[in-house]
A protein has these predicted regions:
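Glycine-rich phosphate/ribose-binding loops and adjacent secondary-structure elements
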Residues: 1-18, 24-29, 41, 57, ...
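Short alpha-helical segments and helix-capping/turn motifs at coil-helix boundaries
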Residues: 3-6, 14-16, 34-37, 60-65, ...
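Extended, highly charged accessory segments
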Residues: 7-10, 30-32, 85-279, 283
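Residues in well-ordered beta-strands of folded domains
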Residues: 20-22, 50-52, 78, 255
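Extended active-site and interfacial segments that coordinate phosphate-rich ligands
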Residues: 30-76, 86-113
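Conserved structural-core and active-site-/substrate-pathway-adjacent residues in large, well-folded domains
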Residues: 35, 76-77, 293, 312
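Residues on a specific face of well-ordered alpha-helices
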Residues: 49, 75, 180, 307-310
Length: 336
């Protein structure tokens, strides 16, 4: 319950990191939840504790070693100078977990996506306008062949190597999505490698959305968040969010399309409107703002959700409003 409560406040730190800390009365270390950084320690008979990334950093007589070990993923190592002992990880966390009724807070306040009942039928695909919509959102033959078809036919994620050596979007003679202008050329390396087994054991796509409270105050209100099993929603799940009126939670759908005839000038005008409508939604007590480009048509074109969400985010931060509402995107752009 303690961990679930704190998950409502802040996402886990993946690292890789090994952090050492002290306040003068105690000294300790903690490892990231994946355990991707080595931290080994010796406790000697002459009351010394030695911790380093590798064994053998300081010469030690093996006969003088009382105990030795390594810091485990997500675990604390603490030496209390006043008590003159090493405090176990379970003892530290049990003390904090027993200070408040975290389980009761979670039960009273947290909302799961499954709790929200959808009314009516979710919007589906219009076969008559499907091709036009795909073109509007930059779908290509390669997108279908290498990304979407493996998902449909083989029920697996498409495989590929990291690093992108395709032609730069700025040199293309075809319209490209704004995301294509930001690519990572090199391959990211982890140490050790992250495999599917480690992913299943440690990693999670679960996330929390909705208004947030003061990080420095431990109150029941922190648990008032909406828990999502994953950040990508099905049409039925999004439809449930759109019509949500549950335990004081409501959502406001904000259209991010504009008339095609307005041209480039319409982009800035629309971004300003989206910011105003989001701020108004906060004043009216909405918990979620859904930025939607579903209204795209021959006469209406969408602002990129990357621009829309980024602009709204920074506008709300600038006006000290960001933590008062959650942002959800309904878009045809999300695929990579």
């Amino acid at each position: 319950d303690f961990y679930e409560y704190n998950s409502c406040i802040m996402e886990p730190w993946d690292g890789p990191a090994s952090i050492v800390f002290t306040d003068g009365k105690s000294i300790g270390a903690i490892l990231d939840r994946n355990g991707l950084r080595p931290s080994r320690y010796y406790e000697t008979h002459d009351d010394r504790v030695i911790m380093a990334s590798e064994v053998g950093t300081i010469p030690i007589d093996p006969a003088n070693v009382r105990s030795k070990g390594r810091l485990q993923p997500g675990r604390l190592f603490l030496v209390d100078f006043e008590q003159g002992r090493i405090v176990p990880d379970d003892e530290i966390k049990s003390e904090f977990a027993a200070q408040r009724p975290y389980g009761e807070w979670i039960k009273n306040q947290r909302i799961d996506l499954d709790d929200i009942a959808a009314a009516g039928q979710a919007a589906g695909l219009d076969e008559d306008t499907l091709l036009q919509r795909m073109q509007a959102f930059g779908f290509t033959t390669e997108t279908m062949q290498f990304m979407l078809l493996p998902l449909v036919h083989e029920k697996r994620d498409p495989l590929g190597s990291m690093g992108n050596d395709a032609a730069l979007a700025c040199l293309s003679d075809k319209p490209r999505m704004i995301y294509d202008y930001f690519r990572q050329l090199f391959a990211q390396v982890t140490n050790p490698a992250i495999d599917s087994i480690r992913e299943e054991v440690i990693m999670s796509l679960e996330c929390y959305i909705g208004p947030e409270k003061n990080l420095l105050e431990t109150t029941e209100a922190h648990a008032r968040r909406l828990r999502m099993p994953h950040p990508i929603l099905a049409n039925e799940e999004l439809h449930a969010l759109k019509g949500m009126n549950y335990r004081g939670w409501r959502s406001k759908v904000i259209d991010i399309t504009f008339p095609r005839k307005e041209g480039i000038a319409g982009v800035r005008k629309t971004l300003d409107r989206i910011c105003r409508e989001t701020a108004q939604a906060i004043e009216e007590g909405y918990s979620l703002a859904i930025l939607s480009d579903r209204a795209v048509s021959d006469d209406r074109v969408p602002v990129s959700t990357l621009m829309a969400s980024g602009t709204v985010h920074h506008y709300l931060v600038k006006n000290a409003l960001r933590t008062q509402i959650g942002l959800v995107l309904e878009t045809g752009e999300a695929r990579e």
